[in-house]
Curated annotation (Swiss-Prot):
Name of the protein described by the UniProt record: Recombination protein RecR
Domain Toprim stretches: 79-174
Keywords noted in UniProt: DNA damage, DNA recombination, DNA repair, Metal-binding, Zinc, Zinc-finger
Stretch forming the signal peptide: none
Start-end of C4-type zinc fingers: 57-72
Pfam families: RecR_C, RecR_HhH, RecR_ZnF, Toprim_4
Keyword set includes DNA repair: yes
Species of provenance: Pelobacter propionicus (strain DSM 2379 / NBRC 103807 / OttBd1)
Function: May play a role in DNA repair. It seems to be involved in an RecBC-independent recombinational process of DNA repair. It may act with RecF and RecO.
GO molecular function terms attached to this record: DNA binding; zinc ion binding
Domain of life: Bacteria
Biological process (GO), any one: DNA recombination
Similarity comment: Belongs to the RecR family.
Length: 197
């Protein structure tokens, strides 16, 4: 019986760690890469480049190659901070061209079942940013999932005593969906129709 070479097995194992990639898909991808050595080389170089150049912005925690990121270093409205779960959600909001403030990436949501509490998120850093002054509004743009809603309510309760406006994206984004997958027009409508909490 023919067995997979150990290097191929390792590649398949690493590919399976990607979201939505099972054994068969990983094997198909591995064989495709083997058939096109130039793609394999380009992919490995790209992975090494991402590892060495991409980091989190020290202000908003979005992924970036420059620190601070282009949004934090630019001339955006610093009086408004949009709080998102991750950098993918930030990019989805940016595609709408409807928001012109700054961002704060939590790097997750409160999820007791997964053992993630508020202290595992970038909430302390958000409070420190607000504490430095100049922030008039925080737009909570967590996803409309159970965890996203719990995180939004936690943030609203935490921020209310600070005397700043707290708003939530309007529910034009379907419940249970991730902002990352919503079209730009819907995101724009949701930003414009956001509600105060």
């Amino acid at each position: 019986m023919l067995t997979k070479p150990s290097a191929l097995s390792r590649l398949v194992g690493e590919l399976k760690k990607l979201p939505g990639v099972g054994e068969r898909t990983a094997l198909r991808l591995a064989f495709h890469l083997l058939k096109t050595p130039q793609n394999l080389t380009a992919l490995s170089e790209s992975l090494l480049e991402v590892k060495s150049r991409v980091r989190s912005c020290s202000i908003c925690f979005a992924i970036t190659e420059d620190d601070p990121c282009a949004i934090c270093a630019g001339d955006r409205d610093t009086g408004t901070i949009c709080v998102v779960e991750n950098s993918q959600d930030l990019m989805a909001l940016e595609r709408s061209n409807a928001y012109h403030g700054t961002y704060h990436v939590l790097e997750g949501v409160i999820s007791p079942l997964a053992g993630i509490g508020p202290s595992e998120l970038r909430i302390a850093e958000l409070l420190a940013r607000i504490g430095r002054g100049g922030v008039d509004e925080v737009v909570i743009a967590t996803n409309f999932t159970v965890e996203g809603e719990a995180t939004a309510l936690y943030l609203a309760k935490l921020l209310k005593p600070l005397g700043i406006r707290i708003s939530r994206l309007a529910h034009g984004i379907p419940l249970g969906s991730d902002i990352e997958y919503v079209d730009a027009a819907t995101v724009q409508w949701a930003l414009q129709g956001r509600n105060q909490l």
